[in-house]
Regions:
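Conserved cytosolic catalytic loops of P-type ATPases
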Residues: 29-51, 55, 187, 216-311, ...
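Transmembrane helix-loop-helix hairpins at the membrane interface
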Residues: 89-225, 337, 344, 440
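Soluble-to-membrane junctions at the N-terminal ends of transmembrane alpha-helices
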Residues: 78-99, 139-162, 318-350, 361, ...
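Membrane-embedded alpha-helical bundles of multi-pass transporters
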Residues: 110-113, 145, 164, 399, ...
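ATP-binding catalytic core of ATPases
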Residues: 212, 441-489, 510-525
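Flexible metal-binding regulatory segments at protein termini and peripheral loops
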Residues: 1-118, 208, 217, 234-237, ...
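Conserved ATP-binding TGD loop and adjacent catalytic N/P-domain core of P-type ATPases
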Residues: 2, 19, 496-498, 533, ...
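Conserved catalytic phosphorylation-site environment of P-type ATPases
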Residues: 275, 334, 371, 381-457, ...
Length: 734
């Protein structure tokens, strides 16, 4: 059986580390696909449970020098504890390195001519490099044992070479003096490099933690405890993991609902803003559904648990956001390839630079070559490359989730950016999707039995018009409906007591050869001219009733259409409704083009026609009659109240069913993709310029040779700048 899980990863020091762990995981038997996200320090693994287990994956990762948190009930809590532990250790190492580096720097500036000053600098720098900077040397040694290299290898090599060269010169100054070379000491360079890099990593860790704020906010919505009623009637508060489907759960005033369930006792207003984005609490009473993470207001009620733990709607949303944040943008595959070879290539360049200085500048080639080699090793930064895409994705997708816009993956963002046509389904998308029956005309000779049959037929349908009819009739169905059949775009059929009944459009009745009452037909025509939808009811012989249904336009529909038009995006409305009703809705929503009387299969066909005409099409619907069109579109957007088939098909889900979120989703895609490109440009251009300058390319022109300390500072802040640029998305207005 295939299973997809997200595991926290520990010990990642750079993008090369993430590439290494990803390679290890993908090499394990049973692993179908594994992606390691350096920015979020997580691994998304799809694996065959018959061939491998989380424990075996954890062992493989541990053998490669890293950690994978598995087999923990609250993985996120364990990961957060580990993150805090590592952050505190990094913080104290940084403070220690800075405190130790300051006197070394002062000694090198003013007291290096004095022998005691050199020895004090030797002791202090050894403490900074090998005690406070021990993480670099330990990790580099561990990677060497696994025949791998990473960013820590570059830091360990550069600072280690600088410190050992300085120590040799301190102990044996005559070796170089006898050859006419001044024995320089670089204790301050090694110390400052360690201090700068630790400071940079501390800032990076803090910034990366901010990028994950959205997913942590969602996780914080999950209650830790739940009150369950036992079989003997006593109430007991237990960890939420102990709750199971079928349990009776008590929800008191001010508490968060811990499970998805159905109210059967009591009533209260519930704040569902975390799901719908609507700030107004919703009244919940017997028979109503409530969801985990929502907040009960002043009343109290009891619910029968339907879904618990990882099956709740909130858990599904968290999982969807995690999957999206862990997905890879198309450009990321190229970045990963660069990151995987970056460190060995830089080490090769550094050695080549050293040799080139020896060959082409024999007088002071050794000293300058050594400095250039150290600077090349220290200034090159795969971290900026590794952070460029995932940090922007994490912040962008997290911002979407905070605004009720769930994005399936990174590819969906890329597609949304190129959309130039949005096709809107009318019912439930442009309109409220809660139609109300305003008028009803029954044929002579009909009675409660016919009304029960109509109610029974419509109860079996999931169309919003059917719900309106059931609410209008307001009676329990006491007749049995057999042979139920749904004819998409036309209506429903069924049998009761040996007679055949139909409910739906006039076309359905006529296709079945049923006689239509003239008076009803005239009244239906009048309703249609008033932009109302008409529902017919008939038996196998004649029309029995005709109902007029009105569905109000959402308050934000016209504004959303106007925003899309301002982006240069063409809008089109499709509906199975009559021409007059469709024209009225299109006019009020500001939609220029529409097509009425469209069957579900015609919607998908129309999307294909638009694509053939060169448009990049987004289809927006609720999944009731448009799942085929959603699947056909370049970008599928499902309104949150739709059926499960729409959620599975959709690349973007709007939780609140608010159409204004559609232009916001498009704008979010533009901002996120633009940020990714800015980050990648900076990361690449930084390395393209920094490495040659560090190698000494400017020396023949103006005698400039970059100081290794400046190189360390530049490297440290290059990755911080990428994360900071991504964090700008959080404050941008959609």
């Amino acid at each position: 059986m295939q299973k997809k899980e997200v595991f926290p990863v520990t010990g990642l020091g750079c993008a090369a580390c993430a590439a290494r762990v990803s390679k290890v995981l993908n090499a394990q038997p049973g692993v179908i696909e594994a992606n390691v996200n350096y920015a979020s320090a997580t691994a998304m693994v799809c694996y065959d449970t018959d061939k491998c287990t989380p424990e075996s994956l954890g062992k493989a990762v541990a053998d490669s020098g890293y950690g994978l948190i598995t087999a923990v009930e609250n993985e996120e809590d364990a990961a957060e504890k580990e993150r805090l532990k590592q952050y505190r250790a990094l913080k104290w190492q940084t403070v220690g390195a800075v405190v130790g580096t300051v006197p070394v720097f002062v000694l090198s500036m003013f007291f290096m001519d004095l022998r005691w000053g050199q020895w004090v600098a030797f002791v202090l720098s050894a403490t900074v490099v090998f005690v406070f900077g021990s993480r670099f040397h330990i990790n580099a040694w561990r990677q060497l044992g696994n025949r791998a290299v990473n960013m820590d290898t570059l830091v360990a090599c550069s600072t280690g070479v600088a410190w050992m060269f300085s120590t040799f010169n301190l102990l044996f100054p005559g070796f170089w003096l006898s050859r006419g070379i001044e024995p320089h000491l670089y204790f301050e360079a090694a110390s400052v490099i360690i201090a700068f890099i630790l400071l940079g990593r501390l800032m990076e860790a803090k910034a990366k933690h901010k990028t994950n704020k959205a997913i942590r906010t969602l996780m914080d919505l999950r209650p830790k405890m739940v009150t369950i009623v036992s079989q003997d009637g006593t109430e007991k508060e237990v960890p939420v993991q102990w709750a199971h489907a079928g349990d009776t759960v008590v929800v008191r005033p001010g508490e968060r609902v811990a499970v998805d369930g159905t109210v059967f006792s009591g009533a209260s207003y519930v704040d569902e803003s975390m799901l719908s984005g609507e700030p107004v609490p919703v009244m919940k009473q017997s028979g109503d559904k409530v969801f985990a993470g929502t907040i009960n207001q002043k009343g109290a009620f009891r619910i029968k648990a339907d879904k618990t733990g990882q099956d709740t709607v909130l858990a599904q949303i968290i999982r969807m956001v995690q999957d999206a944040q862990g997905s890879k943008a198309p450009v990321q595959n190229m970045v990963d390839k660069v990151a995987s070879v970056f460190v060995p290539v830089i080490m090769g360049i550094a050695v080549t630079v050293f040799l080139a200085w020896l060959v082409f500048a024999p007088e002071d080639g050794f000293t300058h070559g050594l400095l250039a080699m150290i600077t090349v090793l220290i200034i090159a930064c795969p971290c900026a490359l590794g952070l460029a895409t995932p940090t922007a994705l994490i912040v962008g997708i997290g911002k979407g989730a905070s605004n009720g816009i769930l994005i399936k993956d990174a590819t969906s963002l890329e597609v949304a950016r190129n959309i130039d046509m949005v096709i809107l389904d009318k019912t439930g998308t442009v309109t409220e999707g809660r139609p109300e029956v305003t008028d009803c005309l029954w044929a002579s000779g009909t009675g409660d039995g016919d009304r029960m049959v109509l109610s029974g037929l419509e109860r079996l349908s999931e169309h919003p018009l059917a719900e309106a009819v059931v609410r209008f009739l307001g009676m329990e169905c006491q007749v049995e409906i057999s042979g139920f059949e749904n004819i998409p775009g036309r209506g429903v059929l069924g049998m009761s007591e040996g007679r055949r009944y139909l409910a739906g459009s006039l076309e359905l009745l006529r296709s079945e050869g049923i006689e239509v009452d003239t008076a009803m037909l005239k009244e239906a025509g009048r309703w249609q001219n008033e932009a109302r939808t008409v529902v017919w009811f008939a038996d196998q012989d004649r029309s029995l009733a005709v109902l007029a249904v009105t569905d109000r336009i959402k308050p934000t529909s016209a504004e959303a259409v106007e925003k899309l038009r301002g982006m240069g995006i063409r809008t089109y409305m499709l509906t199975g409704d009559n021409e007059a009703a469709a024209a009225a809705v299109a006019r009020m929503a500001g939609i220029d083009e529409f097509r009425a009387g469209v069957l579900p299969q015609d919607k998908a066909r129309f999307v294909k026609e638009c694509q053939d005409a060169g448009y990049k099409v987004a289809m927006v619907g609720d999944g009731i009659n448009d799942s085929a069109a959603l699947a056909q579109a370049d970008l599928s957007i499902a309104m949150g109240r739709g059926s499960d088939i729409a959620m599975d098909t959709a690349m973007v889900t709007i939780l609140s069913s608010d159409l204004s979120r559609v232009p916001e989703a498009v704008r979010l895609s533009h901002m996120t993709v633009r940020t990714i490109r800015q980050n990648l440009f900076w990361a690449f251009i930084y390395n393209v310029i920094a490495v040659p300058v560090a190698a000494g390319i400017l020396y023949p022109v103006n005698g400039f040779l970059l100081n290794p300390m400046i190189g360390g500072a530049a490297m440290a802040f290059s990755s911080v700048s990428v994360v900071a640029n991504s964090l700008r998305l959080r404050s941008r207005k959609l």
